[in-house]
Amino acid sequence: MDMGELPLRAVGTVGLTAAPSADVTSSGIITALTAGENLVFGEVCYIASTGKALKADADAIATSSAIVMALATIAADASGNFILHGIARNDAWAWTVGGLIYLSTTAGALTQTAPSGTDDVVQILGVATHADRMYFNPQLVQVERV
């Protein structure tokens, strides 16, 4: 259910749907950004110095600060929606439920195996709530392996 914009001018609660109803959907805090390259649903991005969203990569600290996930196919230099925090569903995922989800050494990708190479960056991006769903909650603290 899309509720559109909801101004928060009074004390109340904001609920997140724990089970998005369809493949490649989400529920949570969303923002619009400009893609710096072609993106697809589920690819995680950092914000470059240009202000554009680029695929995050755990191979180097300079490209590892994932903060958003693309919520659709977004062409380079086009505006699109990204989730900052919430629940995302992709039926192609096959997570181990309850396991942590990390930034991958493949640009834009997620993994349940923490990167282990020299200079790789370990960043927790969330936890698997179901085989096809994750709680997306990117951590700002990162560890660079030496």
Model-identified regions with their sequence ranges:
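Register-specific beta-strand positions within repetitive beta-rich fiber domains
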Residues: 1-13
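Glycine-anchored, exposed beta-strand/edge motif detector
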Residues: 10-146
